Amino acid sequence: MVKGKVTKPVKKATKSKQSAAMISKVKDDFVMTLDSDGEDLEEESADEKEEVEEKPVKLTKKQKKQKLSEADEELLEREKQAAKAGINPDFQFSLDGFAATSEGLDGWNFEVSKDDNKVQKREVDLDSIIKRKGGLLDEDEDEDEAETDVKMEENEDDLAIDGFGGGVQPGKDMDEPEDEDEENKEEVENEEEEDSDGSDSEAEECMHPDDLVLDDHKGPAIDEGPQDTAEEMAAFYAPEEENNDKTESVHKTFQTLNLSRPVMKGISALGYQAPTPIQSRTIPIALMGKDLVAGAVTGSGKTAAYIIPVLERLLYKSSKVAATKVVVLTPTRELSIQVADVGKKLAQYVSGVRFGLAVGGLNLRVQEQELKTRPEVVIATPGRFIDHVRNSPSFNVDDVEILVIDEADRMLEEGFQQELTEILTLLPKKRQTLLFSATMNSSISSLIQLSLSRPVRVMINPPKQAASGLVQEFVRIRKRDHLKPALLASILKKMDKEQRTIIFVARKETAHRLRIMLGLLGVRIGELHGALSQEQRLQSITAFKKLEVPILVCTDLASRGLDIPKIECVVNYDMPQTHAVYLHRVGRTARAGREGRSITLVGEAAADRAIVREAIKSVSESKQGKAVGRNVDWPEVEKLYSKIEEKGDIVNEILAEEKEEKAMLQAEMEVRKGENLLKYEKEIASRPRRTWFQNAQEKKADETSDKRNLLASNKDKMKKKKDNEEVRMYKKTKTDRKEASKRGKPKGKGKRK
């Protein structure tokens, strides 16, 4: 008994020593204040007592109620502190008072981060070659007086362009200059009725005499094949009665769309006040999970119309397993990069949503590493997407729930048919499909291959219509095709250097030659076409967006989807093939309610005049925008032409020097490639061989057929389509042949001889 009494205090003493050692360790880790030392000692002594007498404490009902009331008081105290800090716990998101577009948003980001391209390819510096040959010297600075005279005359020569970057004073009434222009137009018409080059009159009154012959047949550019019948549309599309509540309701604010708060904050960050008509109609339908075929004019907010419902639906996904839920397909790399930037800005407050990019021309390995993480949204071009699905480890599309096809009519063209068919076989059949385009005029027969399930058809604006703020100017070239480069230089010299201008040409060789020629004349200009590397293309767009280069000459690569802010003018150096392509080109300006103008150089081909006639008809029917003729000072153009002819040899020298430098860079790259093959032979040999759904011969055959179809007339295309749609002739089976032999008839076709 005595031993037991002696041992108990010893255990208590050792326990207290251990607790004291722990307390001293805590004191060493934390710096105590003078006021807190005493409090800590009292708490430590209390803790020691609790350790000695460790007994479970049961709370009575009264104590439980008292504890709950203390929690409520603590919650009220927190709310009071939040109110003092200026935070309202009952806050409801409101977008009232925001501008339609944020002034702080300077367009979308096209710059490629350094991590995406660790190995920077050396490119030929064309500007340095042009400078060595005496170009890019800003000849316009020596001709300031001449330019001021030209600008004074521009108000007389160009009809109805005041207010579109043509010298309107801030605060001046926009209606007054238009009335003055109408009066000036009538005066010029009366004075110059017999002018062979045309006068400053409405383009409808400046038609060529041969146009009257073409009124009966609109020409190949307008012939778009048979239209879908009412029965076919009723059988394919969802009935309108099912969606009247969703499609006909007008949402004046985003609040009425019942979007979540993180999505609303992203919308606010971009400065949107109210949904556009296409957004108001399509967002509710997309949130219902229905398939959608939507069309609206360029610059109407179609990208946000499908990004917003996608983000809203991704908020309710399971966050336990990473999986790709959404795939967005676009026809061009630049459009994919722009869509990714729009999505990231809208999703900046949405947690757990990542965007992946899979486009050609950029670092393949970096994209593979990004897709290994299985981002929720993948934005891609068709070819690179198929490449990653087949060859990138840990990336699959088994969980894809939404497929978005931007610029769907372009994707349904023959150039993308093989890739699109392959992608549809890779994706799950149970999915939602959203189609968006500015000219959604594809027939039902082409939409059937997408496996749409009773899609809802939403067409906001009438087809074949340009933006309401666009002034379309037309210049008749007649038999002066050789003066087109000089005419273009004359037009550009009258432009303000602080305004962005896009020039569309038919061929990349023409774009490159125009850049050199205009550079020799002292015009700062960039180029954008398929012959450039992806880095060069993105650099051109970024320089154009930052106004480092105010003029961009490009092919139809840039005619779809690109939203570069404040493009004042579009010049059609070469006429497009169809009116739909024309609408996509001129849609680069006058976007999102802004104003702009287009200048089109019209040749004598029947297809060219048919497109002009269709544009004028659209303006007269919609009573929006203007279509006018533009006067040209041809003597001045001829002077510029002689100047350009003198520099023809220099242009050829620059092209030859550029070709030599490219050959040198290519040789250096081949040497480095050979060195790497020798140095990393085992690593390269151990990599799995990449596969493709087409071999090189099949791909080349498809490209050849695409070129033939592009050059073929619409009549030949319709004949080929009709032949393909014909019912296949019945073919005899083995059973039929046996029965025929029993009846005494010989095998095969034909009568017995």
Swiss-Prot record:
Pfam families in UniProt: DEAD, Helicase_C
Residue ranges, compositional bias (Basic and acidic residues): 697-709
Domain of life: Eukaryota
CDD domains: DEADc_DDX27, SF2_C_DEAD
Sequence motif: DEAD box, positions: 406-409
Helicase ATP-binding domain mapped to chain residues: 283-458
Keyword terms, alphabetized: ATP-binding, Coiled coil, Helicase, Hydrolase, Nucleotide-binding, Nucleus, Ribosome biogenesis, RNA-binding
Positions of the UniProt region annotated as Disordered: 1-20, 34-74, 129-205, 691-753
EC annotation from Swiss-Prot or TrEMBL: 3.6.4.13
Coiled-coil positions: 649-729
InterPro entries for this protein: DEAD/DEAH_box_helicase_dom (IPR011545), DEAD_box_RNA_helicase (IPR050079), Helicase_ATP-bd (IPR014001), Helicase_C-like (IPR001650), P-loop_NTPase (IPR027417), RNA-helicase_DEAD-box_CS (IPR000629), RNA_helicase_DEAD_Q_motif (IPR014014)
Reactions the enzyme catalyzes: ATP + H2O = ADP + phosphate + H(+)
Residue ranges, compositional bias (Basic residues): 1-15, 743-753
Major enzyme class: hydrolase
Main location: nucleus
Compartments (UniProt record): Nucleus, Nucleolus
GO cellular component, one term: nucleolus
Binding-site residues, ATP: 296-303
Subunit architecture: Associates with pre-ribosomal particles.
Domain notes: The Q motif is unique to and characteristic of the DEAD box family of RNA helicases and controls ATP binding and hydrolysis.
Family: Belongs to the DEAD box helicase family. DDX27/DRS1 subfamily.
Name this polypeptide is given: ATP-dependent RNA helicase DRS1
